[in-house]
């Protein structure tokens, strides 16, 4: 876009220099004005001609030569001429033929078509030049970036002839022109040119008048109607104002209008620390450059720092949801890993249970084959217990009779006792043990589990020493009692000492 603007500005400046060097005669200007009026009165014919010229194009809006244009050789000619008619028409306009050969460019006017193919009479071009046509016979040519920003013209409103002003779309960019190649012209030169033409020719004002405003002041604050974006420090507005796009697809949508208006001068960027990583180089506007670099284009080159608020919030919500899903997946994976560990433990438990079942089966097989002999087998026949019945089958221990052990310790065999009980009409539930199996009665003068009776033996003295040591008496008293125990000799004295010791401990 910047290169296209530079190309338009350069062509316009060269046309102004050519007009200043060789002013156009009054007759030629009157004829040009008359032709322009005819074109304005018959817009349908002009649109049909331009449709034929742009047939076969790629769909982009292209300029069309109007009343005064430039041929390939640079000679101006009337619209609709062929290449061979340019010299004759140049003589009619009052321009010498030598100047036509020497000049490389001429005055060029553009027609802009909307996306439906209709010609637009008034349009703000890419180089910020507004051409308005109306019925009042007054046409104003305004130029300059700041002028377009400061103008009060509403781009979205129709002109006096009923044609709506729309965006002309994108145009091919010429790679042969750059912004640095554009030369500037002072506003005084343009006014001087118009003054010389009015004095030398004294032609009457017919049709429309060309009014050129003074050169724009770059230091003056811009107060555009709906600026797209404000600059920094000097508060320079960007090119153009907000225009609704008529394209349904393939066009970059316009930025929305900011609801907040600047209340004061912008913040200066001179105190920005050098360590800031996201501060980009900003090229300031200079009168020598003739144009400015759009801040929006710089932002686009930096990777798209301008996001729509709603789209940015939606992207953040999506990122948050994805992070939550990722966290849930991590939890599920950790639980699955714990399940895998439990699965391994369950498998090991199953193996242990199988081994235990095998061991139990082996023990059952051994127990079923082992035969336990009854005690007393093979005794002497003269032994009183020899009459006890012996299991002839030697059954396993599981099926052993629990009453067989009693027959070995009782005085009479079980069979004889059962027969005796049946003859007496009653059964005896109790049997008498043999004397060798009977316990002796407990003696009161001997030590037993019932009580301790001291005697002259060393065991009795050891028991008394243990009683003294385990008591809660003081150490001095324990040592005194140990000395007394060593001095006692008789059994009676030892018994009295034991009784005295138990009384002292029980206190």
From Swiss-Prot:
Residues 361-377, 396-410 are annotated as: Interaction with the L polymerase. This is Phosphoprotein. The lineage of its organism: Viruses, Riboviria, Orthornavirae, Negarnaviricota, Haploviricotina. GO terms for biological process: DNA-templated transcription; viral genome replication. Residues 134-145, 260-270 have a biased composition (Low complexity). SUPFAM superfamilies: Phosphoprotein XD domain (SSF101089). Homotetramer. Interacts (via multimerization domain and XD domain) with polymerase L; this interaction forms the polymerase L-P complex. Interacts (via N-terminus) with N0 (via Ncore); this interaction allows P to chaperon N0 to avoid N polymerization and non-specific RNA binding before encapsidation. Interacts (via C-terminus) with N-RNA template (via Ntail); this interaction maintains the P/L complex anchored to the nucleocapsid template during the sequential transcription. Interacts (via C-terminus) with protein C this interaction allows C to associate with the ribonucleocapsid. Residues 457-507 are annotated as: X domain (XD). Transmembrane segments: none annotated. Keywords: Phosphoprotein, Viral RNA replication. Gene3D superfamilies: 1.20.5.110, DNA helicase RuvA subunit, C-terminal domain. Residues 41-99, 134-163, 201-231, 250-273 are annotated as: Disordered. The modification Phosphoserine is found at residues 86, 151. Residues 146-160 have a biased composition (Acidic residues). Residues 1-48 are annotated as: Interaction with N0. Essential cofactor of the RNA polymerase L that plays a central role in the transcription and replication by forming the polymerase complex with RNA polymerase L and recruiting L to the genomic N-RNA template for RNA synthesis. Also plays a central role in the encapsidation of nascent RNA chains by forming the encapsidation complex with the nucleocapsid protein N (N-P complex). Acts as a chaperone for newly synthesized free N protein, so-called N0, allowing encapsidation of nascent RNA chains during replication. Phosphorylation on serines by host CK2 is necessary for the formation of viral factories. Belongs to the morbillivirus P protein family. Residues 459-507 are annotated as: Interaction with the nucleocapsid (N-RNA). Signal peptide: none annotated.
């Amino acid at each position: 876009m910047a290169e296209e603007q530079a190309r338009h500005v350069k062509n316009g400046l060269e046309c102004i220099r050519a007009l200043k060097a060789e002013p156009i005669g009054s007759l030629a200007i009157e004829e040009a004005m008359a032709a322009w009026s005819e074109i304005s009165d018959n817009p349908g014919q002009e649109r049909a001609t331009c449709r034929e010229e742009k047939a076969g194009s790629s769909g982009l809006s292209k300029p069309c030569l109007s009343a005064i244009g430039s041929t390939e050789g640079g000679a101006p000619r009337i619209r609709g001429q062929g290449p061979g008619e340019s010299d004759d028409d140049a003589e009619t306009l009052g321009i010498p033929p030598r100047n036509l050969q020497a000049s490389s460019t001429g005055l060029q006017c553009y027609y802009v078509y909307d996306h439906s193919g209709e010609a637009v009479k008034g349009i703000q071009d890419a180089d910020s030049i507004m051409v308005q046509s109306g019925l009042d016979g007054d046409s104003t040519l305004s130029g300059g970036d700041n002028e377009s920003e400061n103008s009060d013209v509403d781009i979205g409103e129709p002109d006096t002839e009923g044609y709506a002003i729309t965006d002309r779309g994108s145009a091919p960019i010429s790679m042969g022109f750059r912004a640095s190649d554009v030369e500037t012209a002072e506003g005084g030169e343009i006014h001087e040119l118009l003054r010389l033409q009015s004095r030398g020719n004294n032609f009457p004002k017919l049709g429309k008048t060309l009014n050129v405003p003074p050169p724009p002041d770059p230091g003056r604050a811009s107060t555009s109607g709906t600026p797209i974006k404000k600059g920094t420090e000097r508060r320079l507005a960007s090119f153009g104002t907000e225009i609704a796009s008529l394209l349904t697809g393939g066009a970059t949508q316009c930025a929305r209008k900011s609801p907040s208006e600047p209340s004061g001068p912008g913040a200066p960027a001179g105190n920005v620390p050098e360590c800031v990583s996201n501060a980009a180089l900003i090229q300031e506007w200079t009168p020598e450059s003739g144009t400015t670099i759009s801040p929006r284009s710089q932002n686009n080159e930096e990777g798209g720092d301008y996001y729509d608020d709603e789209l940015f919030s939606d992207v953040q919500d999506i990122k948050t949801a994805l992070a939550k899903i990722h966290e849930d997946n991590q939890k599920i994976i950790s639980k699955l890993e714990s399940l895998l560990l439990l699965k391994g433990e369950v498998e090991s438990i199953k193996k242990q249970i199988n081994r235990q079942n095998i061991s139990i089966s082996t023990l059952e097989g051994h127990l079923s084959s082992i035969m336990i002999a009854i005690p007393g087998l093979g005794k002497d026949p003269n032994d009183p217990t020899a009459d006890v019945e012996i299991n002839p089958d030697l059954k396993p221990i599981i099926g052993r009779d629990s009453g067989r052990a009693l027959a070995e310790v009782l005085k009479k065999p079980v069979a004889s006792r059962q027969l005796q009980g049946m003859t007496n009409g009653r059964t005896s539930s109790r049997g008498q043990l043999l004397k060798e199996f009977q316990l002796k009665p407990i003696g009161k003068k001997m030590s037993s589990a019932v009580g301790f009776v001291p005697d002259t033996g060393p065991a009795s003295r050891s028991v008394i020493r243990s009683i003294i040591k385990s008591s809660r008496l003081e150490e001095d008293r324990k040592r005194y009692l140990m000395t007394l125990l060593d001095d006692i000799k008789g059994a009676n004295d030892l018994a009295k000492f034991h009784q005295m010791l138990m009384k002292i401990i029980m206190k």
